[in-house]
């Protein structure tokens, strides 16, 4: 018991502190001083610390909100880009199909045009052949008539008199003129 009373007695012999200050010697500080310092820190530091945490929380929330807005805008832009891509792909397919159908149509038109040109050339060829045949036939007829006429004239000259000869010539000339009109 003497030790306990000595402790209280020795408390009375402490000198009073001349000023308030911090004791930086951790081993010389007692739990009462530590609890006072910790209490003061908690009391005054709580507001500062909570303000720091609130500011940090607001910055984090704002950053998250901004990130979500940016993400939403990026998603909207992505959807718009995808829609434009689908539209462009559809237009490209349409142009491709129109191009193929136009090529087929041009090919058919070219084939039809060539076919018509060949038909016209065939018709011109047939007309030319027919015309040449008619010309040759007319020339042959004319020569046959000329030879027949010369033969008839030769026979008439040897067999007929002048008067009969003149009548026959006039009749043949009339007949020859009628034949010429028919052939022309």
UniProtKB/Swiss-Prot annotation:
UniProt keyword annotations, A-Z: ATP synthesis, CF(0), Chloroplast, Hydrogen ion transport, Ion transport, Membrane, Plastid, Thylakoid, Transmembrane, Transmembrane helix, Transport
Localization (cell): Plastid, Chloroplast thylakoid membrane
InterPro entries per the UniProt record, alphabetical: ATP_synth_b/b'su_bac/chlpt
Entry keyword NADP: no
Domain of life assignment: Eukaryota
Disulfide bonds: none
Any Pfam family matching the protein: ATP-synt_B
Principal subcellular localization: plastid
A GO cellular component entry from the record: proton-transporting ATP synthase complex
Presence of the UniProt keyword Transmembrane in the record: yes
Transmembrane segments: 27-49
GO molecular function, one term: proton-transporting ATP synthase activity, rotational mechanism
Subunit structure: F-type ATPases have 2 components, F(1) - the catalytic core - and F(0) - the membrane proton channel. F(1) has five subunits: alpha(3), beta(3), gamma(1), delta(1), epsilon(1). F(0) has four main subunits: a(1), b(1), b'(1) and c(10-14). The alpha and beta chains form an alternating ring which encloses part of the gamma chain. F(1) is attached to F(0) by a central stalk formed by the gamma and epsilon chains, while a peripheral stalk is formed by the delta, b and b' chains.
Additional remark text: In plastids the F-type ATPase is also known as CF(1)CF(0).
Family note: Belongs to the ATPase B chain family.
Protein role: F(1)F(0) ATP synthase produces ATP from ADP in the presence of a proton or sodium gradient. F-type ATPases consist of two structural domains, F(1) containing the extramembraneous catalytic core and F(0) containing the membrane proton channel, linked together by a central stalk and a peripheral stalk. During catalysis, ATP synthesis in the catalytic domain of F(1) is coupled via a rotary mechanism of the central stalk subunits to proton translocation.
Name of the protein in question: ATP synthase subunit b, chloroplastic
Gene: atpF
């Amino acid at each position: 018991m003497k030790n306990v009373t000595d402790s209280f007695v020795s408390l009375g012999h402490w000198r009073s502190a001349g000023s308030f200050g911090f004791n930086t010697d951790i081993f010389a500080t007692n739990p009462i001083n530590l609890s006072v310092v910790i209490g003061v820190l908690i009391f005054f530091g709580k507001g500062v610390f909570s303000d720091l945490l609130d500011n940090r929380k607001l910055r984090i929330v704002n950053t998250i909100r901004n990130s979500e807005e940016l993400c939403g805008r990026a998603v909207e832009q992505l959807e718009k880009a995808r829609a434009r891509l689908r539209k462009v792909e559809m237009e490209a397919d349409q142009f491709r199909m129109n191009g193929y159908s136009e090529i087929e149509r041009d090919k058919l038109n070219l084939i039809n045009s060539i076919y018509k040109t060949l038909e016209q050339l065939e018709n011109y060829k047939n007309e030319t052949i027919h015309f040449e045949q008619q010309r040759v036939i007319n020339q042959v007829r004319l020569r046959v008539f000329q030879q027949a006429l010369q033969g008839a004239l030769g026979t008439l000259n040897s067999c007929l008199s002048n008067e009969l000869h003149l009548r026959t010539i006039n009749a043949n000339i009339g007949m020859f003129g009628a034949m010429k009109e028919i052939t022309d």
